[in-house]
From Swiss-Prot:
Name of the protein: Phosphoglucosamine mutase
SUPFAM superfamilies reported for this sequence: Phosphoglucomutase, C-terminal domain (SSF55957), Phosphoglucomutase, first 3 domains (SSF53738)
UniProt GO BP: carbohydrate metabolic process; peptidoglycan biosynthetic process; UDP-N-acetylglucosamine biosynthetic process
Protein family: Belongs to the phosphohexose mutase family.
Post-translational modification: Activated by phosphorylation.
Cofactor comment text: Binds 1 Mg(2+) ion per subunit.
Cystine bridges: none
Length: 446
């Protein structure tokens, strides 16, 4: 079996709705292929959740038809955060969990990602086995063996109670005023309840999904509205989730953004203070140098993984560590969850705020972020602009200008048709100009 994946990217199968492979016919066959592979493993039961995109209705119907044809039973949760599906997959002893979501992408994109029975991303060999089944003609099981579909009516309540259980029982959020931005996504009916039930005064925004407004000028990918609201309401802090609830970005009382690097730093430092830190912290190639330096000053080990929460998880398991993060807001806390969980990560930071009696602003000052600029260049997928001589020359010139006080990273996105250009260093103006210089060279060679 070839190890070259044709459909599965770093976060499942993803694309524009109506364009291959995110079409009803392909998703039906994907459900059947996955069902064929998973049916060999035991319970023949699958949990299916989705975010709030309008296309979710179409895709879950197609997916369920394929699974049923392979003899698997599907249990629908309705709109549900990605980490909630991972949790429910474990608690229901299901064979797998499936999430219909394109995470932080616009509403016209969608995707399918799978969790194993342990609530983790599917192993490579299972993904490859599913791809191999996709090459075959669909064959239904006998009529008596066809799968059935049911709905789990209390999924939200179960997950809310789980999230609350990760917050120290001796602490309360009673003194905090929090603005919660749910990105008009999957956390809209969950996150406000979690923080309210723990005592916080919650102001909710991004909680009116209509199928097309997910991630639109709200949520973790665009915190401007949250920053403004936190200041206007004189709130203690703000929380921004992405469309499927696996990313968290925070905002302090002054309206300053607190990203995934800073969140992981705060959680690690608090664990160290309590004597509960197990090992070090895993970041990625995009992790700010300021985080690496801040952790080193505390004596906390740090290593970088490739970009993508899948690779952060792999490195955590390899090292036996418990805390991993991406600056985009994926925070993985393996002593509490099996995948990136934005609500659980937020609760750990809030526990630090309450326990230390320090503001989020004060806690985040423990590390100094280097200026970092990220430019995204549209890329149709033809050729490889990263190999162009003009691009290589631009990178060499920028690296010479930055010297030992900065770095450059160019990579293809694993989830979108983009080339990402990241430049980081001590001199903010130089970093900005350098990023634009490289981005222009990439554009000229796309």
């Amino acid at each position: 079996m070839s190890d070259k994946r044709r459909y599965f990217g770093t976060d499942g199968v993803r694309g524009k709705v109506g364009q291959y492979p995110i079409t009803p016919d392909f998703v039906l066959k994907l459900g059947w292929a996955a069902g064929r592979v998973l049916a060999k493993q035991g319970t023949k039961k699958v949990i299916i959740g989705k975010d709030t995109r309008i296309s979710g209705y179409m895709l879950e119907s197609a997916l369920e038809a394929g699974l049923a044809a392979a003899g698997l039973k599907a249990t629908f949760t309705g709109p549900m955060p990605t980490p909630a599906v991972a949790y429910l997959t474990q608690t229901f002893r299901a064979e797998a969990g499936i999430v219909i979501s394109a995470s932080h992408n616009p509403y016209y994109d969608n995707g399918i990602k799978f969790f194993s029975s342990e609530g983790t991303k599917l192993p490579d060999d299972i993904e490859l086995a599913i791809e191999a089944e996709l090459d075959k003609e669909i064959e239904c099981v006998e009529s008596a063996e066809l799968g059935k579909a049911t709905r789990l009516n209390d999924a939200a309540g179960r997950y809310i109670e789980f999230c609350k259980s990760t917050f120290p029982s001796e602490l309360s959020l009673a003194k905090l005023k929090i603005v919660v931005d749910c990105a008009n996504g999957a956390t809209y009916h969950i996150a406000p309840n979690v923080f309210t039930e723990l005592g916080a005064d919650v102001i909710a925004m991004g909680v009116t999904p209509n199928g097309t407004n997910i991630n639109h000028e709200v949520g973790a990918t665009d915190v401007r509205a949250l920053q403004q609201r936190v200041v206007e309401e004189q709130a203690d802090l703000g929380l921004a989730f992405d469309g499927d609830g696996d990313r968290i970005i925070m905002v302090d009382h002054l309206g300053n953004k607190v990203d995934g690097d800073q969140i992981a730093y705060i959680i690690a430092r608090d664990a160290l203070r309590r004597g509960e830190l197990k090992g070090g912290v895993v970041g990625t190639l995009m992790t700010n140098l300021g985080m690496e330096n801040g952790l080193k000053q505390l004596g906390i080990p740090f290593v970088r993984a490739a970009v993508g929460d899948r690779y952060v998880m792999e490195k955590l398991l390899e090292k036996g560590w418990k805390i991993g993060a991406e600056n985009s807001g994926h925070v993985i806390l393996l002593d509490k969850v099996t995948t990136g969980d934005a609500i659980v990560a937020a609760l750990q930071v809030l526990a630090s705020v309450v326990g230390s009696e320090l503001s989020l602003n004060e806690l985040s000052k423990g590390m100094t972020l280097y200026p970092q600029v990220l430019e995204n260049v549209r890329f149709a997928g033809q050729g490889n602009p990263l190999e162009a001589e003009a691009v290589k020359k631009a990178v060499e010139e920028v690296e010479a200008d930055l010297g030992s006080k900065g770095r450059v990273l160019l990579r293809k996105s694993g989830t979108e048709p983009l080339i990402r250009v990241m430049v980081e260093g001590e001199d903010g103006e130089l970093v900005q100009n350098s990023a634009l210089k490289i981005a222009q060279a990439v554009k000229d060679n796309c």
